[in-house]
């Protein structure tokens, strides 16, 4: 007596197809780094070799590109959130971007523009502040805001003191 086995079902997608579909679904929301996608695949229990094959294919067709991601991330976070070089580097590192790619993405930023962005952020906040004789509270809040965005203590203090004096002069006129 011979036992026959039915042919493998073609309606059930393979693990590789499922992993590819997951990656494509994640990429429709926003671009992601290779490390982020690998982490999501591992979190959902896909074997590492399946994840590597899927990610290699997505990289080959240009859907996953850490250099493009880093450049876009730096441009977006710099313009919208006012982040400093240090904060941007930390964010990219947390997303699994390689140090060389981070360095390349941040190479176009200069210190003068960073200080200018800090001044702009402080000016915007100061317009809404009610200034009193005691500047300590306002100064503390503004320095903390810049620190949260990754600016150094020195730059934050210098910018806040200068902009606070300029705002006081502006309001006197």
Swiss-Prot record:
Entry annotated with the keyword Cytoplasm: yes
Keyword terms of this UniProt record: Cytoplasm
Subcellular location: Cytoplasm
GO biological process terms, semicolon-separated: regulation of DNA repair
Cellular-component GO terms for this entry: cytoplasm
A family per Pfam: RecX_HTH2
Disulfide bonds: none
PANTHER family given in the database record: REGULATORY PROTEIN RECX FAMILY PROTEIN
Functional note: Modulates RecA activity.
Family per record: Belongs to the RecX family.
HAMAP family recorded: RecX
Protein name: Regulatory protein RecX
Species per Swiss-Prot/TrEMBL record: Mycobacterium marinum (strain ATCC BAA-535 / M)
């Amino acid at each position: 007596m011979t036992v026959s086995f039915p042919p493998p079902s073609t309606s059930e997608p393979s693990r590789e197809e499922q992993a590819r579909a997951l990656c494509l679904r994640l990429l429709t929301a926003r671009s992601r780094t290779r490390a982020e996608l690998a982490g999501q695949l591992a979190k959902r229990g896909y074997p590492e070799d399946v994840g590597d094959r899927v990610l290699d294919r997505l990289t080959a067709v240009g859907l996953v590109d850490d250099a493009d991601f880093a450049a876009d991330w730096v441009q977006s976070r710099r313009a919208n959130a006012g982040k400093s070089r240090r904060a941007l580097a930390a964010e990219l590192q947390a997303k699994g971007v390689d140090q060389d790619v981070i360095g390349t993405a941040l190479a176009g930023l200069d210190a003068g523009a960073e200080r200018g962005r800090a001044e702009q952020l402080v000016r915007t906040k100061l317009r809404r502040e009610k200034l009193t004789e005691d500047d300590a509270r306002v100064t503390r809040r503004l320095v903390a805001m810049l620190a949260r965005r990754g600016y150094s203590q020195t730059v934050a203090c210098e910018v806040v003191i200068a902009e606070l004096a300029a705002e006081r002069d502006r309001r006197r006129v």
